[in-house]
Amino acid sequence: TTLFRSCTAQAAEASGKTKQEELRRQLIVMTGWQYDDLPRLGEIPIPEEALLEEDPESDRTQALAANFSLAADRRRLENTDSGTAKDVLNQKVEAGQQKIEADIEVKYNSLMQAQTDYGQAKEEYRLAEEKLEADERRYQLGLLSANDRMAAQAELSSKKAAWEISGLSFRQAYEDYQWAVEGLAAYEG
């Protein structure tokens, strides 16, 4: 079973590297490069967990104020004479406000979940590091087989990949939330 776990972990690591390479190529093409170009891709900064000071109430207010489509419809509503057109526009503005508020709430919840997932993955990686250190000592003392040692190394690689992926998801959720607050929350669907 140890050999199986080691092989499984190595396969997971190889699969992760393959997915990473596919994503890198997609990113290169999406940003206007040729698929076989080799631009230098830097690290994506992960938001500092302790520095997140999101306030959904004030952010909701800011998102409503910053949304261009909502502001345009409000101006149209002010300049529309009474009647069916005004009623329809009024309903559109109210529905748009509700949709923006709901979008902010969904993105905030996604951000909080991504932050939790990131923290958990970070802790799992730390524990895998400690386990590998202990396994290295046991291996040096002859108390652990080479296969078990390789399995621990593969598990550490797997946990590191999971931590990095959760960090990227955390960053994406953070950016999505910030852009929604800055006026790009869903208004019409």
Residue spans for each PLM region:
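Extracellular, luminal, or virion-exposed ectodomains of exported proteins
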Residues: T1-A12, Q26, D81-V88, A95-Q98, ...
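Charged, solvent-exposed structural "stalk/scaffold" segments
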Residues: T1-A14, T116-E164, W179
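Short, solvent-exposed, mixed-charge loop/turn linkers that connect secondary-structure elements
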Residues: K17-S58, E175-G189
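A glycine-/polar-enriched beta->alpha junction
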Residues: T61-A71, E78-D87, E94-Q98, T116, ...
